[in-house]
Amino acid sequence: MSGIMRVPSILAKNAVASMQRAAAVGVQRSYHITHGRQQASAANPDKISKQYPVVDHAYDAIVVGAGGAGLRAAFGLVAEGFRTAVITKLFPTRSHTIAAQGGINAALGNMEEDDWKWHMYDTVKGSDWLGDQDAIHYMTREAPKAVIELENYGMPFSRTQDGKIYQRAFGGQSLKFGKGGQAHRCCAVADRTGHSLLHTLYGQSLSYDCNYFVEYFALDLIFEDGECRGVLALNLEDGTLHRFRAKNTVIATGGYGRAFFSCTSAHTCTGDGTAMVARQGLPSQDLEFVQFHPTGIYGAGCLITEGCRGEGGYLINGNGERFMERYAPVAKDLASRDVVSRSMTIEIMEGRGAGPEKDHVYLQLHHLPPKQLAERLPGISETAMIFAGVDVTREPIPVLPTVHYNMGGVPTNYRGQVITIDKDGKDVIVPGLYAAGEAASSSVHGANRLGANSLLDLVVFGRACAKTIAELNKPGAPAPTLKENAGEASVANLDKLRHANGQITTADLRLKMQKTMQHHAAVFRDGPILQDGVNKMKEIYKQFKDIKVVDRSLIWNSDLVETLELQNLLANAQMTIVSAEARKESRGAHAREDFKVREDEYDFSKPLDGQQKKPMDQHWRKHTLSWVCNDNGDITLDYRNVIDTTLDNEVSTVPPAIRSY
């Protein structure tokens, strides 16, 4: 550590001054740079760093991320009496949850008879039978309660004429186990449901004594003796380091859409949580399953909600034809997202695309009444005008499949506990570590997520993390002890990147990664392209050692932050493309031209009774686990079984079958 440059004295003085301000406002809510009343102490442990100011904190629980899942976990913990720190790299209401448009699924039955068991069936089918049915059982059963809870918090749902929560049609949703036609299950706030949900949860969190650490960048988890004991974070405002100790840590950092060139994700969606977990030698799960949303605005990538099709919009090709009935005769434009994205891509590949280059299709809305567009899709009308120059009451929107969601993430059980496997392949709980939302893989989405199940995932499993922690721990218990040098490796990495003086800039290397992933891990994949992508990504990963950071400061250093984020993105991208190349089948969002069939342990086109089950190494209905092994980006893969059992006898397992819409 002797080569680390010493922080200027003015920075140390600023850090002390900020702590004095924190003490002065200790009677107020702990917020922003406030260090949490009596839980913080000034420190500069020689064993970590003699150069960087360090502040130690002790809490009952830590939540990393303040989107929907993080906020729901945080105030759920505080409600149970746990002193909770919320660490977030941006203000809570800027979290990407705000970008969700269409709605949140729950079998309320406001539009017609509905049942959560039908919702469960649709979710298992939508996952292409890769989803864990105990977790899907839990989520869909809890869904009606979760939505009513949101309503009680004040979430301003759109209403029917008789005052009930309005529910629209959404892709892959059916009645009577797929035999009763289209379901209207998606509870909506016009086309701004995520915005409303995030503000509702944030407002609710302010009713509780959550300790917010806003614009703090989580650098790494702190592990000792095989258990998670805290988090090391960088205060972006003054450059101080903060070491948080707690018996329980919840990862709620969202996805990593920014590993791709065209995506609907905010620039902050950089997979920080999955990368932090990977650096502790723990696996990520099913990262090869990346959802392409059918309707991103052509050329911009901005999301156009599936709710447009739920309200009666439909897709047309360059010849003006409605083409989805060729691919999904029953559901048509409301087939599952992977089906619609592939259908659009086929239309374009076969020369029926729209525009001068015939490289996109159209979403038509102008046949809908202007009043319906104004009331149910006001945000889309605005977005289409800004980003495509289109008046939706007069002309169609040019659209193209765009990276939207990561089905994979940190593997967890349905209680939110992070899991790994032992040498016998059995699930093992990682003590002290939880995950929820897009950062997690519980796995309720399997190989493909149904639209409007993501917001449901956030609130159900954010709450589940809080409940599990409350069941297993008592508030006010002593925080775990740490070794004097806990976090030392993370500080060394920070300092190394801060003073990196290589040949390639962060922006240039990030662009190379994004274009490689976009081309080599797209809607359709095949062996040679995937293998080429694996080779290219390995070289890009190695080039990170030659990164150049221009800004050496510690105060609002966006160059340094983007470099830390790129380090996280590279880990996620590498695991994604290696896992995709290894999976020799087509399932859900993973569609291979050279392996077009789904490979289950049984022949799912026939009755399962009497069939011999294939060994695990002869089929692909299994979860991929991926580990980052070293600084060169080498990836190790293993697999774990899909959970087919439900939580109890109130609902039966959904057996694998042909998936058609």
Curated annotation (Swiss-Prot):
Its EC number is 1.3.5.1. Substrate binds at H293, T305, H404, R449. GO terms for molecular function: electron transfer activity; flavin adenine dinucleotide binding; succinate dehydrogenase (quinone) activity. It catalyses: a quinone + succinate = fumarate + a quinol. It is an enzyme of class 1 (oxidoreductase). It is found in: Mitochondrion inner membrane. GO terms for biological process: electron transport chain; mitochondrial electron transport, succinate to ubiquinone; respiratory electron transport chain; succinate metabolic process; tricarboxylic acid cycle. SUPFAM superfamilies: FAD/NAD(P)-binding domain, Succinate dehydrogenase/fumarate reductase flavoprotein C-terminal domain, Succinate dehydrogenase/fumarate reductase flavoprotein, catalytic domain. Residues 1-41 form a transit peptide. InterPro entries: FAD-dep_OxRdtase_2_FAD-bd, FAD/NAD-bd_sf, FRD_SDH_FAD_BS, Fum_R/Succ_DH_flav-like_C_sf, Fum_Rdtase/Succ_DH_flav-like_C, SdhA/FrdA/AprA, Succ_DH/fumarate_Rdtase_cat_sf, Succ_DH_flav_su_fwd. Its main location: mitochondrion. Pfam families: FAD_binding_2 (PF00890), Succ_DH_flav_C (PF02910). Flavoprotein (FP) subunit of succinate dehydrogenase (SDH) that is involved in complex II of the mitochondrial electron transport chain and is responsible for transferring electrons from succinate to ubiquinone (coenzyme Q). Maintaining electron transport chain function is required to prevent neurodegenerative changes seen in both early- and late-onset disorders. Component of complex II composed of four subunits: a flavoprotein (FP), an iron-sulfur protein (IP), and a cytochrome b composed of a large and a small subunit. This is Succinate dehydrogenase [ubiquinone] flavoprotein subunit, mitochondrial. The lineage of its organism: Eukaryota, Metazoa, Ecdysozoa, Arthropoda, Hexapoda.
